[in-house]
Amino acid sequence: VNNETVATLDLSSETAWQYVGGDHVYDEPGDGRKARFRFDEVHTLLGRQVEKDDHIQIVKVGDDQNAYGIDFIELEQAAPAIERPEGAVSVADYQGAKPDDGVDDSDALIWAMNQAAAPSKTVYIPAGTWEFGRKIGLDHSGLTIQGAGMWHTNVRFTSDQAGGGGFVFNRGVGGVTMTD
């Protein structure tokens, strides 16, 4: 912004092409599969307000040979991070779990959901990127899973196995709220 570096974005073409055959989506081309292009969406906080007439420039700083096409950028004012609600159980309370470390936080989330099942019913996922390497079963009705806000908490499922990530509502579970 105005010739000052305010953020760095990591872009990847890893999921740029998918191949559809019947009801299935594949990462590799094959007979009868139709190629489909998708976009890598990334977001970041700039740490400052962008004002009218500011100049925004995106510059490639890596030395790879990849070309990048930027379709568009979208700017919006990000709300401040949401603080931990009173009485909430935080995933960060689990044995030193912390965001942005590349470590699987599945056990921390499962622990927090089990702890919140009776006393508070709220699980808090603080700001940062939290990685989950497997499918997370929701076992308790009435839970609220609360992040620090869409610009602050990132939930990333890292399994490369089909059906290996995401949330699954186990039998009889309902009334779960996931927010921010």
Task: List where the protein language model places each region.
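Hydrophobic beta-strand segments of well-ordered beta-sheets in folded domains
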Residues: 54-56, 88-89, 121-123, 179
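N-terminal extracellular ligand-recognition/capping segment immediately after the signal peptide
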Residues: 106, 110-163
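Extracytoplasmic
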Residues: 1-86
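Extracellular beta-rich ligand/substrate-recognition surface
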Residues: 30-38, 103, 157-162
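Signature of short aromatic-glycine-proline-rich micro-motifs recurring in repeat-based ectodomains
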Residues: 35-39, 108, 173
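Right-handed parallel beta-helix/beta-solenoid
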Residues: 74-110
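Parallel beta-helix/beta-solenoid
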Residues: 168-180
